C-alpha cells in the first residue's frame, strides 16, 4: 500500500523560517491557499520551493495548497512606502440601502496563550491559519483583490520601541501610550489636513502626539482594484498622561476618535479617514487583501519582534465586489462571520436610544461621542460600534455580547433548571435591547480577554481546542494551525448561543456556562424583574358580537375588506387555526398598477433570506423563536437599575379587546389614545399630510408628558362620511419615525387598535414599522359574526367544517396570526419579534418618496408612486362605499385571490388559456395571433407593460433574423417537482424541451433513470417504456437537462447528478421565497417514494433553507461540490427578485456559479400560504435590471449566464427580458397551460381535474397534453421574437441583450398615479465585453486542480474503477482539500450508476479533511479518515462507508471531543458512517437511507429524516427528531436528560423492546467498535444488559409497524424475526 504525500501543508506548518526580514535576505514562508480567485500575476510573483516537498511535479501544480517562498527584496524591491502614482480614490456612496446590500461572510479564528506571553509564533500561526481559510473568502473581478483580511493583536511594544529608538524617541510608556492604526486619504494634501485635524483634537484633549509612523507596506502584492482605493496607512503614537486606569485611557482614546470622526464628517475627504484601531491594548492590521497577502503586504507582521500573546484573524467574503478597505475585519473589537438580518431596525433603535444613553464614566460628554451607528458601515461595523460603546461604558466584552446577541434561552431545560440567574439576565435585557439577530460567529477582544460566541441558531461553524502548553484555538475550521495532537487536551465546538472566553490576565479559560453564570451574578436581575415587571395574563375573548350586522358590514367596507378577505382569510383562520393555503402565483397587477383600490399594505413586499443568510423553520425549530413583547419605556442600557425592568410583558403581539383594556389600566404606562381619523370637509388635498402632522405632534406631547404607551386607534362609536381613517400603517410609521427623530422613541411603545388589520401580512407590516402590539377589533368581530351565523352553524352540524365555539374561533384566528408572523420572521432568518419590530424589512412598490420619507424612512422604493393626496383618494374610495346609497348588503368580491368575471384582472385567465390551447393543439398561426392580441390588449399588469420598444434602425426581412431553432435553445421550463405535478406532465414537458434543444427542469424529487435514454420502441405515438404518454416519437428522451438540487435533496443521488447538463441550486422560489415545502403523504405514491428514497404515504418535508447554505461562502462550497462530482455540468443558482439582489448575485458569481436565475414574485407554486403568494418577492424586471447592471459595473457579467422567469407568456416578454439583460428565459405556468393545465387553481388539493397536478391515477388518466403542444407553443414564441427583431432592425437576440436604450415608457395613463418613475429600468451601465452567445458557450467553471485529481492520476485506482478491482491507497489531507472523493464517486457513478460498481476503492486519509469530505460517496467506496473533519461529511452519499477516528496518540478523550462538523449525512440515500467522537449540529439532517453511529451530537439531530438508522452513544443537543417522518434513531441516555430534548410532534419515544430493533442496534455498535476502536462502544457491548435499557428508540408513524420498532414481532427459535398475531 503506497504512501503518497498529496498535501505539503503538514510539512509547511512545521517549518520555521531561519530568518524573517533579515539584513541579507528577506524570505517569508506562507501557506499559499489558492482558489479560482488566484490570478496568474500572483502566481508569477511566487516561486515554489520544490525541495520542501516530495510531491511530483503534477502535485506541485495543484493550487489547493502550495508552499511558497517569496523573495521580497529581489522580486519586489520593497521600500518603507511605495505609493508611486496612486490613482484617485473612487468615491464610495453609502446609505442605509447600501448597508442592506453590503453582505458577506468569512473565515475567522483566534489563537491565545494562557500564560499571556507574547511571541512572534502566535502571529505567524495566525497568518498560516488565515492562509488555510482563503477558500472562505472572496476576490474581486480582477481575481486578485481580496474582499478583505486582517489581524488583531496586542500592541507589540518592543517592536515599536526599536522604531522609536531609530527616530530618537524615548521608549514608549506602555501604560500611558495609545497607538492608532489609521487609513488616511490618498491625496497628500488631504492626508496632511487629516493629520492636522487629528493632532489638533489630541492636543485639545490634553494628549501629546509622540510621533507618526508610515506603516511599511508591499504595494505590488495588492490586487489592481484594491490598489486603486488603497489609503495611506500610518500609525500615530499619543501620550495620555492624565489617566492611570487602562479603562480610563481607553475611554479617553475613544472620545478623541469620536471627536475626530465628527470633525472630518463634513470634509470632502472625510470618508477616507478611518481608524482601524486607537487603543492602549490592541492594534488591527487589515485591508482589501487575500489571506496570504496580509503578511506579505504588512512588513511589520513578518518581523520577529512583532510579538503578541493572542491574535484574531479574519478573511472576508463580500457579496459586494467593490468592498471598502475600512470594512475589512477584524473591527476594533469584533471579527464577525455572518450577517445581521435586523440591521436596519438595530440602527433605528440605536439612533432612538442615543438621547437616553448616559453613564457616569463619561462625565456628561455623551453628546460628544454620538452617533453610535453609521449607516455607511456594514452590519459588522455597526455591531462593533454597539459593543464598543457598551464596553467603553464599563461592560465586559462577554457581557456586551450576551446583551447584543443573546442565546435562545427560552425552552432551554438546562438553563432554566441549573442556571436560572442566566435566564433572569436575558429576561432583564430583553426589554432594554433588541437582539442583533442573524448568523454570527463573533470573535472579540479588548486586549485583556479574547473569546468567541455564536448566534442563537448556531448557523456558523466554530471549533475550538486547547493544548497542554497553554494555547487555546478557535477557528471556523479545524486543521488550519499546526498542533501536536498528543498535546491537545480538549476539543469541542461552539453550539448555538454558546461562548468561550480566555482571560489573558489571570490565565483562565471559561466555557459557556462558566462565562454566563459569572456575568449574570453581577446584579440581582431576578429580583428586579419580580418586583417591577408585570405580565399581561390571558383575557377571555368576547362571547358575542359587539356591533350589529349592518354596522359590521359598513366598517368592513370602509376599511377595505372584500368577501375574499373575510371568507378565504379570516373565516378560514377562525375555523382551521392556520393560515390558508393556495396555489399558482400572484398574477394580478401590482397595487400601484391596478385599476382597483388597494389597502396600503399591498404596496409592501416582505423581504426574505437568500444565500447570505438562511431562513428558519418556524414549525420544527420554534424553540429558538419568540413573539414575546415588552411594553413600556426602555431604560438607559448603560446604567442598570430595577426601574429598567418596569414593563408589561405580552406573550405575543395580538391583543383582544379585553387584553387592550387591561393594558390601558396599567398606571405606570400612563396610556394615551390618539385618534387616527382625518377631516376632508375642506377638501382632500393636503388633508392626509396635515392629519399626520397633528398626529405626530400629539404623540410627541403625550410622550413628553410621561406616557409610555401610545394607542393609535381608528375605533369610533359611529363612522362619519367626512372623517375617514388614516391608513393605520401610515399612522404607525409616521409616529414611529417622528419619535425616533426627536429622541423620544425609547420612552414609549406604540399599539395599534385598528379595524384595518386582518391578515398576517398586515400584522407584520405594523410591527415591522414600529407597533409593539395590535388589537384587530374588527377582525375579531368578524370571527364572532361568522361563528354565530346560521350558515356556519349548519356547516358545523353537517360536519363540513370543524365545530368550534365562538371563543375558540377567535383563539384559532389569533393562533393563525401568530403562526403566520413566525413564518414571516423566519423567512428573513429572524428569530425574535422584538428584533423584527421597527426593522422595516420590506420593499415598497408604488409609493412616492414623500410618503416613504415621512413614514417608512429608509425603506427601498425604486419606482416611486402615489403621493399623499393620491393615497388619500385611494383611502376614500373604500370609505365612500360604506356610505353610498347603493351599498350592497354583502361585501364586494374584488377578485384579488381567485379569478372572477368583473373582478381584478388575472393574467392567467380562462380566456387566455383557451386561446393558447386552441393555438397549440390546432397548430394554428392565426389562433396564436389571436392569443398575442389578447395579451397586447390586457390592462397594465406588470412593470414591463409600461414600456415599449424603440429603434434607431430600419426594419429588416425576417429571413435575416436568426432562426427559431436557435432562439428556442434559450428557453427552459420551471423547476416543477414530480410530486407536485403528475408524471405525465413532467415527462411531456421534458420530451418537448429536448425536441427543441431547450431545457426542462426536474424540480425537486429526482428522476427515473428510465428517462435518461432515447426511446426506440415508439409505435403510433405510444411507447411501452412510457405507456402513459401519447404523441411520442422514436428518439424522444424524457430526461431533464436541468436537474435541481433543492433543500430537501430528495432524489439527489450521484447518478442523478452526473447525468445532468446543468445543476440548479434552488435557493428561493418566486411564489414563496424564504419558505420550504411539504409533499403531503397522499401525494407520495409508490413511484414517488421510490424516486425520493422513502416510503409511500410518508410526508416529505423540504426545509426552508439548504442546511449547507447559511452564508455566501457556504453556497460557494456547494457549487464546488457539484462541480466536483460533475465537472461537465454548469451550476445554476436560482434567486428571487428583491432589493439588493445585485450584490447577492455578485457574490454568487464570485462563488463560481455558471448561471444565475432571477425569478419574479409572480411565478407559480403547487402550494403556499396566501400571504406568501401575495406579499413576498419582487418583479423580475427590477431584479434582473439590478443584477445585470451590478454584474457589469463590477466586471463579473461575462462570468455568468443570466436567466429569468416569472410570468413570461410571449415573444414580447422574451425581448423585454433580453433588453434588461437576460440571456435565457424560463416558462413555468405557461408551459403547464400549453400541455393542458386549465388553471383550476386547486393544485394543493391533489384534485386537478385534468391530472396535471395530481397523483390520483383516475385524474392522471385525463391528462390531455402531448409534447408536440409545448413544442408548438415555443416555436410560436420564437417566431414572434423573430418578427419583432426584424421590425427593430436587429439580426439576433445577441444584438439587443442588455440594450435598455431600446426601451421607452409607453404613453399610457394609470388610474391611480402618474408619478411612477421607470428611470431605474431604463438606466444603462453598458454591455458585457462578450456576446450572450459567447457567454453561453463558455466552458463550465472549474474547481482547478483538486486532491481527487491526484487520486485519479494513480493507474491502480483507474484500473480498479475500469475493471471493478480492489485498490487501497493512503493519502494525506488538509482542510483546504474539500469535497474529497466527490470526483472519484462521480467517475464511478457515470460508468456504473448508483449501485452497479462491483469493485472496491479503499482510501485512507491522514489529517484534517476539508468540508464535504466523502460527499456523494458511491457503493464500493470505503474511506477512512485518521484525524478529524469539518462540516458536511457524507453529504449526499448513496453508499459506501466512511470511518473517522482520531490519530493514535492523543491527549483528549475521543468520545468527549468533536471529530466531525455540522450537517453531516445531509440528503444521504445510502451507506454508513462511523465516527469515534461527537458531531456538530444537524447530524443526519434529511437522511434518507444511510446508517450512522456517532458518540454525541449537537442540536437538531435527525431533523427531517425520512429513512435510515442513527445511533448516538453520547449526549445530544435540543430539538432531536424535528420533522422526522421516517427511519429510526437509538439514543443512549445515561443521565436521564434526553426526553426534554426530543421534539415530540411526530415521533414516538420508546425503549428498545423489539428483538429486531435490539439486533439492529447491537450490530451497528459492533461494527462501530470494529471499525473505529471505540472504547465507549466496547464498554456498552461488554455491559450490554446494563446499557440496553438506557437506550431510547425514536419511531415516526411510518416505522411503527416494522420489526425493529414493534414488539409484535418476535424472534423464533431459529433466530428469525416474525410477526406474532394477537
From Swiss-Prot:
Coiled coil: none annotated. One of its GO terms (cellular component) is plasma membrane. Disruption phenotype: Displays photorespiratory chlorosis when grown at ambient CO2. It is found in: Plastid, Chloroplast stroma; Mitochondrion matrix. FMN binds at residues 1184-1241. Its cofactor is [3Fe-4S] cluster; FAD; FMN. The keyword Transcription regulation does not apply. The keyword Phosphoprotein does not apply. GO terms for biological process: L-glutamate biosynthetic process; photorespiration; response to light stimulus; response to sucrose. Its EC number is 1.4.7.1. Residues 106-505 form the Glutamine amidotransferase type-2 domain. Its main location: plastid. It comes from the Eukaryota. It catalyses: 2 oxidized [2Fe-2S]-[ferredoxin] + 2 L-glutamate = L-glutamine + 2 reduced [2Fe-2S]-[ferredoxin] + 2-oxoglutarate + 2 H(+). Residues 1-105 form a transit peptide. Binds 1 [3Fe-4S] cluster. Induction: Up-regulated by GATA21/GNC and GATA22/CGA1. Induced by light or sucrose. Involved in glutamate biosynthesis in leaf. Required for the reassimilation of ammonium ions generated during photorespiration. Belongs to the glutamate synthase family. Interacts with SHM1. This is Ferredoxin-dependent glutamate synthase 1, chloroplastic/mitochondrial.
